[in-house]
């Protein structure tokens, strides 16, 4: 999934004409060096494109308007090398609808104590030029990101890369289409929500399709395409005896391959990058899509079970953010607990649909086993465990007057004992700060039972994503205490009521 290749971030230098052509030329020469260095040495996921120097209100407004309509541009990164009077930026910032990052840096890392004169001081004015720019953003009540540090600093590089990933995710959100196969699981509350409000807030559209629409595409899949896909399965996974050639569940595997091919074809034809299924809406399908969903998630699609479109969209967004990073991202559900003093654990899984991008095993086991839910034939699925390491669970919920993004930091652990009778993929983790506090805080905040589990994307990216969209962000980690967490929820309630 190469979502960054066609994207770019515009690097914009603001100044004013009173400095004269010589100084302004030096500013642009320095900017060229900074951009070239960042593109070649900083490991950024998205290319920086240096734009012409802007020194007047008309130039700034024209540039912001151009950025809005350029589909390759996912955001603007500004550097106030000199002083740029911020009233000049009001017109441009008032129409800008792309993410904005203020890089508060300067060309020189250290002060040249013995040679510094007023010419040097006039050229290198980031320290107060950046403050002028910051004021107008605050005065206009426009949230923009600020990163401070020298342009050769590794930490600054990392933070710029994070911002780029989130900017790309916002761009993806604006064009994302989510397909719901069937409707919501009956009587379930948290998977419901205001899809119109979500499209206004995030940009993505959510539409439902009768299961018959999918079945028609599935039934049209050819035997040759199925055979080719099964060959891919055989090269990629370990097979149980039941699904090997002449195995008693071989036909179930072929049916699963047909469903995968049909489902992917449907999504591709409609331009969908996320989807949901529901085991209560399976008429015409021979089995609940398990293997198909797992493999589509690994290819970058978002997914939510039981019609959970918010989790499906969020999963796609995190897939975009985490492109190229170590670790995977999956649909997940807190399934059962291990209450043991000093070793409280959570087993996360789902009926079938856990993404192999988080698999510890190089070749997961492909098997067909009974599923007591859905009333269909035994479904195919990949079975694996998850490697130890830091991770998080994220949930997007509709609070009526706002959307809330809830995140719990967790520590994934090695599976402590074999699970010979559990025929599904799973992850096992210790919740921060403890199982008791994390679970109570999650429940108090109304967090969903479905989550996006990620070992690739971190808290900083999700907090920034919430800021870019103007939604509530709540974090449960080692610093969380329940009294403070409850107070934060109360304060947020007041803020979002006043800020409607």
UniProtKB/Swiss-Prot annotation:
Transmembrane segments: none annotated. CDD domains: L-arabinose_isomerase. Binds 1 Mn(2+) ion per subunit. Its cofactor is Mn(2+). GO terms for biological process: L-arabinose catabolic process to xylulose 5-phosphate. It catalyses: beta-L-arabinopyranose = L-ribulose. Keywords: Arabinose catabolism, Carbohydrate metabolism, Isomerase, Manganese, Metal-binding. One of its GO terms (molecular function) is manganese ion binding. Pfam families: AraA_central, AraA_N, Arabinose_Iso_C. Pathway: Carbohydrate degradation; L-arabinose degradation via L-ribulose; D-xylulose 5-phosphate from L-arabinose (bacterial route): step 1/3. It comes from the Bacteria. It is an enzyme of class 5 (isomerase). One of its GO terms (cellular component) is cytosol. Mn(2+) binds at residues 306, 333, 350, 450. Its EC number is 5.3.1.4. InterPro entries: Ara_Isoase_C, AraA_central, AraA_N, AraA_N_sf, Fuc/Ara_isomerase_C, Fucose_isomerase_N/cen_sf, Lara_isomerase. Belongs to the arabinose isomerase family. Catalyzes the conversion of L-arabinose to L-ribulose. Homohexamer. This is L-arabinose isomerase. It comes from Yersinia pseudotuberculosis serotype O:1b (strain IP 31758). The lineage of its organism: Bacteria, Pseudomonadati, Pseudomonadota, Gammaproteobacteria, Enterobacterales. The gene is araA.
């Amino acid at each position: 999934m190469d979502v960054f290749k066609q994207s770019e971030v515009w690097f914009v230098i603001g100044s004013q004409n009173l400095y004269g052509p010589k100084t302004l030329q030096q500013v642009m020469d320095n900017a060229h060096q900074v951009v070239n260095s960042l593109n070649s040495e900083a490991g950024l996921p998205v290319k920086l494109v240096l734009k012409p120097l802007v020194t007047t209100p008309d130039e700034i407004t024209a540039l912001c308007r151009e950025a809005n309509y350029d589909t390759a541009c996912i955001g603007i990164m500004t550097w106030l090398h000199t002083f740029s009077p911020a009233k000049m930026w009001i017109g441009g910032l008032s129409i800008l609808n792309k993410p904005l990052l203020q890089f508060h840096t300067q060309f020189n890392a250290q002060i040249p104590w013995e040679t510094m004169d007023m010419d040097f001081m006039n050229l290198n004015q980031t320290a107060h030029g950046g403050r002028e720019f910051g004021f107008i953003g605050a005065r206009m009540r426009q949230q923009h990101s600020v990163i401070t540090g020298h342009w050769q600093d590794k930490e600054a590089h990392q933070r710029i890369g994070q911002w780029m990933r989130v900017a790309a995710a916002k761009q993806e959100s604006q064009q994302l289409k989510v397909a719901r196969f069937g409707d919501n699981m009956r009587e379930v509350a948290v998977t419901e929500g205001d899809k119109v409000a979500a499209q206004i807030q995030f940009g993505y559209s959510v539409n439902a399709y009768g299961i018959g629409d999918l079945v028609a595409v599935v039934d049209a899949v050819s035997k040759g395409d199925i055979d080719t896909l099964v060959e891919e399965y055989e090269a990629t996974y370990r097979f149980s005896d039941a699904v090997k050639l002449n195995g008693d569940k071989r036909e179930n595997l072929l049916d699963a391959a047909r469903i995968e091919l049909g489902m992917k074809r449907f999504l591709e034809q409609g331009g969908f990058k996320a989807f949901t299924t529901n085991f209560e809406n399976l008429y015409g399908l021979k089995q609940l899509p398990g293997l198909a969903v797992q493999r589509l998630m690994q290819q970058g699609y978002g997914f939510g079970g039981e019609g959970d479109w918010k989790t499906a969209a969020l999963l796609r967004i995190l897939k975009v953010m985490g492109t190229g990073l170590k670790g995977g991202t999956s649909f997940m559900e807190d399934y059962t607990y291990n209450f043991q003093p000093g070793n409280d654990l959570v087993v996360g899984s789902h009926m079938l649909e856990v993404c192999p991008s988080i698999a510890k095993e190089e070749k997961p086991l492909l098997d067909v086993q009974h599923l007591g839910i859905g009333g269909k034939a035994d479904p195919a699925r990949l079975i694996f465990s998850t490697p130890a390491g830091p991770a998080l669970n994220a949930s997007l919920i509709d609070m009526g007057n706002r959307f809330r993004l809830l995140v719990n930091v967790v520590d994934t652990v090695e599976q402590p004992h074999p699970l010979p009778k559990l025929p599904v993929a799973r992850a096992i983790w210790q919740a921060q700060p403890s199982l008791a506090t994390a679970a109570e805080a999650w429940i108090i905040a109304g967090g969903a039972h479905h989550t996006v589990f990620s070992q690739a994307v971190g808290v900083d990216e999700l907090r920034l994503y919430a800021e870019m969209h103007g939604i509530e962000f709540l974090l449960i980690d080692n610093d969380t205490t329940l009294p403070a967490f409850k107070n934060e929820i109360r304060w947020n309630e007041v803020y979002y009521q006043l800020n409607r």
